[in-house]
């Protein structure tokens, strides 16, 4: 199998990001964004996906974490799409239900080439998590889905603790990505012959 890897850089007035990704890795992850909770969530995602991931971001966290989180999601999604290449042979669809203490999240996705996000249950999250508004994480998932060109459904099913809910979501996303990216065949899994 061809090595499925990509490197992405992005520099704006808000963030400077450097990212390298190997899809079929060993779960070796190094993330430094200047926002500890983001580092924690992206480390979980990469580990559970089995990615080798190195991501550094110098963002305008003196404002808040919004641009850092949003751009990290976009770059990670772009790297994932690039690493998969023509997507021939992948399972394409993946899902996972992951508990974290009292919280349970379900993640379902399709590497369809048609970006879309459904994010349900976010009313369970407290208004502020790790010093930032809870809606910040919707922006991450939206940016990731757009960059990766995937149809992504995340359902926070139940739970009380915002950290636990998000941790189960990021672990679930990683596991669902691992399953969807698995090579199971030679042909492209599409009756129309295209994933766009």
From Swiss-Prot:
The terms describing its cellular component in GO are: cytoplasm
User: What organism does the record attribute this protein to?
Assistant: Oleidesulfovibrio alaskensis (strain ATCC BAA-1058 / DSM 17464 / G20) (Desulfovibrio alaskensis)
Q: Key word Cell membrane present in the record?
A: no
PANTHER family (UniProt xref): IMIDAZOLEGLYCEROL-PHOSPHATE DEHYDRATASE, IMIDAZOLEGLYCEROL-PHOSPHATE DEHYDRATASE HIS7
Pathway the protein takes part in: Amino-acid biosynthesis; L-histidine biosynthesis; L-histidine from 5-phospho-alpha-D-ribose 1-diphosphate: step 6/9
* Protein's name in the database: Imidazoleglycerol-phosphate dehydratase
Q: Which reaction does it catalyse?
A: D-erythro-1-(imidazol-4-yl)glycerol 3-phosphate = 3-(imidazol-4-yl)-2-oxopropyl phosphate + H2O
What's this protein's family per the entry?
Belongs to the imidazoleglycerol-phosphate dehydratase family.
Q: Which GO terms describe its molecular function?
A: imidazoleglycerol-phosphate dehydratase activity
Localization: Cytoplasm
Query: Entry's SUPFAM superfamilies?
Result: Ribosomal protein S5 domain 2-like
Give UniProt keywords alphabetically: Amino-acid biosynthesis, Cytoplasm, Histidine biosynthesis, Lyase
Gene name as annotated: hisB
């Amino acid at each position: 199998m061809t090595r499925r890897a990509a490197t992405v850089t992005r520099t704006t007035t808000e963030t400077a990001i450097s990212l390298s990704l190997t899809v079929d890795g060993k779960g070796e992850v190094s993330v430094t964004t200047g926002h500890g909770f983001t580092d924690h969530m992206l480390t979980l995602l990469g580990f559970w996906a089995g990615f080798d991931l190195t991501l550094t971001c110098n963002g305008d966290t003196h404002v808040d974490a919004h641009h850092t989180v949003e751009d990290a999601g976009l770059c990670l999604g772009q790297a994932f799409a690039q690493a998969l290449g023509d997507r021939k042979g992948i399972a394409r669809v993946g899902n996972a239900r992951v508990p974290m203490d009292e919280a349970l999240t379900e993640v379902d996705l399709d590497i369809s080439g048609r970006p879309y996000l459904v994010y349900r249950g976010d009313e369970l999250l407290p208004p502020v998590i790790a010093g930032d508004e809870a809606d910040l994480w919707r922006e991450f998932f939206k940016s990731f889905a757009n960059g990766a060109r995937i149809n992504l459904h995340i359902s926070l099913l139940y739970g009380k603790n915002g950290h636990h809910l998000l941790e189960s979501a990021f672990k679930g996303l990683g596991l669902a990505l691992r399953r969807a990216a698995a090579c199971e065949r030679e042909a492209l899994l599409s009756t129309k012959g295209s994933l766009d």
